[in-house]
């Protein structure tokens, strides 16, 4: 945290920075961002995430050299008045492996061991908080430690960091927490135990909301219908991605929810011609070459969203895959986010030939980054909640006793009015603590205040419930 109380963060395995851009939107200062692929890190530069050019670190995080560059940036920010890194965000590659009866190969385990690097960097940096985002099975997936032990990732995180942090892991579908598309993922949040009596990871999770439909997000005239190969004149990122024209017949007559594999005419089913004979493609997944439905939730955005043959990519009525702009809306990426080193106005002013050249050079990278990203709104909400917690007034036990005496809170009616008015702008845990201390019968009735840390620990070990009501025996 800087002297002006503004917050700082570090982002690891940051790709194009789509997710952690949410922290940028909330006014956080990016100390360092690490990504091994330069073309993705370049996108972060275009968006001005880091104030210092040296904050963009391209390199393998497993090497001492890359780690040293990150630590050097922390030192630079200490000289600028930063007392401590506030948040470390990490989205390490993780190969999902079933915990039962599943063969694990060396490359899978090595990829999962990048989680080890993230955890060890958190331990070295000692931020106030950390946020890991990953696949649904993240915590149950195996990784290999530096001493060659194979352990579950969730257990490893708690073994290494549990002494210093309150840790919660939660599996949620992002479409119910701020994203516009389905994406079931794990969030693991750790909060320094110094804050155990004021806020916990559960206070930082994004808020629940009903999912939106495809029509809500890109329908009802939000986007112009596109002709073959058209790039919208006033929005470079809304464009018709072309493909082999012979494939158009496969999807042209489909209604919402129908697949090209359902066409009665074999010439309209996905196929190739070998020695003059039609050889139909194998139908591996129902959702390939399938028109999406307007009035259902938006399916997960995948990395191969450029292909008709990929999952859930075909527009409900137009003969094309979703445009980059439509995908940005699905992933809650701000309209002004830059994918190339030109402003939207500059892109729109270019000739068609110039626009197509930029698409040719950048479209695959953009679409892959979209498919791998954390929706911006998810991280923005977490960033906003962290900031809100740090902005709240904190009081010591001595201060609480002074407040009780100042307002005469031993009187029940006075206490009720104090809680309703909250003239000292206290946080909820502090109000609860005051109520407990002023309850003369707390020992007789065992009416003790249970702090948030204990509640968080109980919640963290509970299983996920699928029913609205459960019986507890």
Label each PLM-derived region with a short phrase:
Residues 1-3, 14-17, 72-84, 94-288, 360, 367, 373-388, 394, ...:
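Class I S-adenosyl-L-methionine
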Residues 2-125, 136-140, 144-150:
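Core alpha/beta nucleotide-donor-binding catalytic domains of modification enzymes
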Residues 9, 317, 442-446:
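A detector of helix-start/N-cap boundary segments at the beginnings of structured domains
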Residues 11-20, 82-101, 129-135, 188-192, ...:
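Conserved proline-anchored active-site loop of SAM-dependent methyltransferases
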Residues 241-395:
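C-terminal target-recognition/interaction regions appended to catalytic cores
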Residues 17, 38, 93-96, 136-137, ...:
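Short, solvent-exposed loop/turn segments at secondary-structure junctions
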């Amino acid at each position: 945290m800087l002297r002006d109380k503004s917050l700082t963060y570090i982002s690891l395995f940051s790709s194009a920075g789509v997710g952690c851009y949410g922290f940028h939107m909330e006014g956080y200062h990016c100390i360092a961002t690490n990504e091994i692929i330069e073309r993705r890190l370049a996108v972060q530069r275009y968006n001005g995430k880091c104030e210092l050019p040296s904050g963009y670190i391209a390199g393998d995080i497993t090497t001492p050299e890359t780690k040293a560059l990150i630590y050097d940036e922390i030192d630079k920010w200490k000289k600028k008045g930063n007392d401590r890194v506030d948040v470390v965000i990490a989205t390490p590659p993780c190969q999902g492996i079933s915990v039962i009866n599943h063969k694990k190969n060396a490359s899978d385990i090595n990829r999962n061991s990048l989680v080890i690097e993230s955890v060890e960097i958190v331990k070295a940096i000692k931020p106030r908080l950390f946020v890991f985002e990953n696949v649904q099975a993240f915590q149950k997936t195996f990784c290999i430690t530096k001493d060659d032990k194979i352990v579950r990732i969730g257990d490893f995180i708690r073994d290494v960091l549990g002494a210093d942090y309150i840790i919660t892991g939660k599996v949620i579908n992002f479409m119910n927490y701020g994203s516009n598309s389905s994406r079931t993922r794990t969030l693991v949040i750790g909060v320094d135990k110094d804050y155990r009596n004021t806020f916990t990871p559960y206070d930082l999770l994004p808020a629940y909301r009903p999912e939106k439909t495809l029509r809500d997000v890109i329908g009802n005239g939000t986007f112009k219908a596109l002709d073959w190969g058209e790039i919208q004149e006033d929005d470079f990122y809304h464009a018709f991605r072309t493909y082999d024209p012979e494939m158009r017949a496969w999807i042209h007559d489909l209604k919402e929810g129908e697949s090209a594999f359902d066409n009665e005419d074999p010439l309209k089913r996905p196929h190739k011609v070998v020695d003059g004979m039609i050889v139909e493609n194998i139908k591996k997944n129902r959702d390939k070459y399938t028109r999406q439905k307007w009035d259902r939730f938006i399916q997960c955005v995948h990395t191969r969203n450029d292909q008709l043959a990929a999952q859930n990519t075909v527009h409900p009525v137009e003969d094309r895959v979703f445009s980059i702009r439509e995908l940005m809306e699905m992933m809650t990426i701000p309209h002004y986010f830059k994918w190339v080193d030109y402003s939207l106005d500059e892109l729109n002013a270019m000739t068609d030939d110039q626009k197509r050249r930029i698409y040719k050079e950048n479209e695959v990278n953009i679409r892959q980054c979209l498919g791998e990203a954390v929706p911006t709104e998810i991280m923005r909400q977490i960033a906003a909640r962290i900031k809100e917690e740090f902005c709240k007034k904190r009081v010591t036990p001595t201060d609480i006793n002074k407040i009780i005496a100042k307002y005469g809170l031993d009187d029940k009616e006075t206490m009720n009015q104090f809680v309703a008015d909250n003239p000292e702008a206290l946080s909820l845990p502090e109000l609860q603590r005051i109520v407990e201390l002023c309850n003369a019968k707390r020992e007789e009735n065992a009416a003790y205040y249970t702090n948030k840390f204990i509640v968080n620990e109980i919640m963290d070990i509970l299983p996920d419930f699928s029913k609205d009501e459960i019986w507890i025996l």
